[in-house]
């Protein structure tokens, strides 16, 4: 079996050693080169043609952002960002530029933390063999075009074009309308979520809940970033937060988000992951809870990601009479979670990322005309 060939790019000697040690503990991985800055990194990528690059963002001579732009344009390669929590805002910019995923940077002498980081890195490296690089490049170029277009509009507009929507006065909602849109994602999820949420109208008549596999400490910055870009109210969920129309709750990293109905209100409950939860925040835990609490008024959406998280949830939503969507293979960065959801046989529609927001809006009763 051919090994996964990796180049490690980091100006810190300690980080290079720690990352290399983590990688070389995987029998299917071979570290084939190192670089201490972006310029050297580009030369190594061109010469060695690795399957994967681990990348520090802050380096001398050429930073990780510049390297990402050049690599994605001329030599598309899978990139996992290695970042400290103090750089979490920069991580999401790197994901926009085409990085596949990120892991927290190891710190000296914290053995328990290093073990957790190693497990996270191993899982994401193994996902490289399922990677849709063409989809990443297509997504990155579409986002660049969208950003340029956004610059031509007024400063108050969202960075993605919205579908034409009807107002409540011209389109009365049916009695059995959806109450919640629940979206789950993993690898490749942050840019996909940004694209979808920024295309929804500010007066969105449903609540939106999101579980994105992400370490503790990063989800708050992710939510704050999306809140600045989207017309919706977006925040990291706290225990007891109300689930209400026009609001997006993002499950906090390292925890699961479930729901509890209290009279006419529904509240989020933030709970510790179960022993069977391989991925956290768990998409299945969120979707199963939605099926129980919201029943047929649930729209479940499974986006890009490794593994099968979400497949139990879509089955439960279907049994409860709700609706489900899955991202199409051609746009999914990793077609693992959507594939497993589709394999249940209960997904109502398979939708490419570029049409997902329109499909959600249509199913929520707002879209005036769909082709």
From Swiss-Prot:
- Keyword field: Chemotaxis, Cytoplasm, Hydrolase, Phosphoprotein
Catalyzed reactions per annotation: [protein]-L-glutamate 5-O-methyl ester + H2O = L-glutamyl-[protein] + methanol + H(+); L-glutaminyl-[protein] + H2O = L-glutamyl-[protein] + NH4(+)
Q: What class of enzyme is it?
A: hydrolase
Q: Provide any one GO MF term from the record.
A: protein-glutamine glutaminase activity
Its subcellular locations are: Cytoplasm
Residue positions where 4-aspartylphosphate is found in the record: 56
The CheB-type methylesterase domain sits at: 174-362
Its EC number is: 3.1.1.61, 3.5.1.44
Q: Which PROSITE patterns match?
A: CHEB (PS50122), RESPONSE_REGULATORY (PS50110)
Modification after translation: Phosphorylated by CheA. Phosphorylation of the N-terminal regulatory domain activates the methylesterase activity.
Q: Show the active-site residues.
A: 186, 213, 309
Domain (Response regulatory) ranges: 5-120
- What are the recorded Gene Ontology BP terms? chemotaxis
Name the family the entry cites: Belongs to the CheB family.
Name of the featured protein: Protein-glutamate methylesterase/protein-glutamine glutaminase 3
Give the organism, scientific name: Geobacter sulfurreducens (strain ATCC 51573 / DSM 12127 / PCA)
């Amino acid at each position: 079996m051919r090994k996964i060939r990796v180049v490690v790019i980091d100006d810190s000697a300690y980080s290079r050693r720690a990352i290399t040690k983590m990688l070389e503990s995987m029998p299917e991985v071979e570290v084939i080169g190192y670089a201490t800055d972006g310029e050297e990194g580009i030369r190594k990528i061109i010469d060695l043609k690795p399957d994967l690059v681990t990348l520090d963002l802050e380096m001398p001579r050429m930073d990780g952002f510049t390297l990402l732009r050049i690599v994605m344009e001329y030599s598309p390669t899978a990139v996992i960002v290695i970042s400290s929590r103090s750089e979490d805002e920069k991580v999401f910019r790197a994901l926009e530029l085409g990085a596949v995923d990120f892991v927290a940077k190891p710190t000296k002498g914290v053995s328990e933390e290093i073990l957790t980081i190693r497990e996270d890195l191993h899982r994401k490296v193994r996902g490289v063999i399922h990677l849709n690089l063409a989809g990443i490049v297509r997504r990155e170029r579409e986002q660049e075009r969208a950003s340029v277009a956004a610059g031509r509009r007024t400063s108050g507009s969202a960075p993605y074009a919205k579908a034409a929507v009807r107002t409540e006065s011209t389109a009365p909602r049916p009695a059995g309308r959806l109450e919640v849109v629940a979206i789950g994602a993993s690898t490749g999820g942050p840019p996909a979520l940004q694209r979808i949420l920024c295309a929804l109208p500010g007066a969105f008549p449903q609540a939106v809940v999101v579980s994105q596999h992400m370490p503790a400490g990063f989800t708050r910055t992710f939510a704050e970033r999306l809140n600045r870009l989207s017309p919706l109210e977006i925040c990291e969920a706290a225990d007891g937060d109300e689930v209400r129309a026009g609001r997006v709750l993002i499950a906090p990293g390292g925890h699961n988000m479930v729901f509890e109905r209290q009279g006419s209100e529904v509240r989020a409950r933030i709970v510790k992951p179960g022993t069977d939860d391989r991925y956290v925040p768990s998409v299945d835990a969120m979707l199963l809870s939605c099926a129980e609490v919201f029943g047929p008024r649930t729209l479940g959406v499974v986006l890009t990601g490794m593994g099968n998280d979400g497949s139990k949830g879509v089955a439960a939503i279907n049994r409860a009479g709700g609706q489900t969507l899955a991202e199409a293979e051609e746009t999914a960065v990793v077609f693992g979670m959507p594939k497993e959801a589709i394999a249940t046989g209960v997904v109502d529609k398979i939708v490419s990322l570029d049409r997902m927001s329109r499909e959600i809006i249509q199913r929520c009763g707002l879209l005036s005309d769909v082709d």
